[in-house]
Amino acid sequence: MSSAICPCGSGDLLLACCGHYHAGQPAPCAEKLMRSRYSAYVLGLTDYLVQTTLPVQQAALDREAIAQWSAQSTWLGLEVESAEVLGGKPEHAFVTFTARWHDGNGEHSHKERSSFVQNQGHWYFIDSTVPLKAGRNDGCPCGSEQKFKKCCSAYVI
């Protein structure tokens, strides 16, 4: 494992790249978090994928489905097209990427523009497949103590 190349496509060793984040060090930016999440799919690190999703969405994630998809796929690569840091308090970002994999149904390519939010020194993926149950004037689910309409509502794709 110490000489394994990181699956995220950086060309660095896993331990010097995404391995830090898998071991508990917070990712310094949304792009690094997204890359570490791709690596987690490759490595079957379901707990990491759940922990790096917005905390209010974690209970709704299907851990078994995540683990099965991870295990049943041969991961072919990741290409990051762009990372847009939008600033603000809390800080928000979009990362556009394409992930490729092969499974029992053939080869697949998925392009996505993912949303991220930083709270208390940690970046989190905002999962667009898990509804955020918040009205515009409710507190934001990211934990920022701002109203949803002033915080994450514009970043939920």
Curated annotation (Swiss-Prot):
Pfam families linked: SEC-C (PF02810), YchJ_M-like (PF17775)
Signal peptide start and end residues: none
SUPFAM superfamilies with a match to the protein in the record: NTF2-like, Sec-C motif
The family this protein is said to belong to: Belongs to the UPF0225 family.
UniProt name for this protein: UPF0225 protein PSPTO_4127
Organism for this UniProt entry: Pseudomonas syringae pv. tomato (strain ATCC BAA-871 / DC3000)
